[in-house]
């Protein structure tokens, strides 16, 4: 694993971020959301060159509603934010390098196999302290249960009596 070229490790990280298919128990952003993100990005680039043209994002031959596209974009932003905040939080312990901390957060948030560095396939998370393990556990829950239901728990409207 550690002898692999950097390009192969980058491909592995990208696959870890994408995760599995929609409806599966796999974590990650999911294949459908990733495809929609690329289509949305392509539309926005085209929009800069033809700002007056109405361009509909199509998926499997059907137009995708703007609300769905904004939800996908928001999910991606929240995913990246949680990944970076999680990696930063566990790096506060100062025990491991950036590669290890970032891939540890990614493996937990995406619920995939081993990371890189000190959390690689022949290593484990035992080198982290209690605070980092708590953060990583929360990332695992957020990744497994999807991000928005977890974030909804912290919304005040959920806890108000109706």
What are the residue ranges of the model-derived segments?
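Membrane-proximal intracellular helices of multi-pass ion channels
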Residues: 1-162
């Amino acid at each position: 694993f550690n002898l692999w070229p950097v390009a192969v490790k980058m491909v592995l990280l990208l696959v870890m971020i994408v995760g599995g298919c929609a409806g599966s128990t796999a974590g990650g952003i999911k294949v459908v959301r990733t495809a929609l993100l690329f289509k949305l990005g392509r539309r926005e680039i085209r929009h800069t060159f033809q700002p007056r043209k109405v361009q509909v994002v199509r998926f499997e031959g059907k137009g995708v509603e703007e609300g769905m596209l904004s939800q996908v974009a928001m999910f991606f932003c929240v995913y990246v934010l949680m990944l970076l905040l999680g990696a930063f939080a566990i790096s506060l312990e100062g025990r491991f390098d950036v590669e290890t901390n970032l891939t540890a957060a990614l493996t937990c948030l995406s619920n995939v196999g081993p990371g890189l560095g000190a959390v690689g396939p022949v290593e484990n998370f035992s080198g982290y302290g209690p605070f980092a393990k708590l953060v990583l556990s929360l990332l695992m829950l957020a990744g497994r249960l999807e991000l928005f239901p977890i974030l909804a728990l912290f919304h005040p409207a959920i806890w108000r009596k109706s």
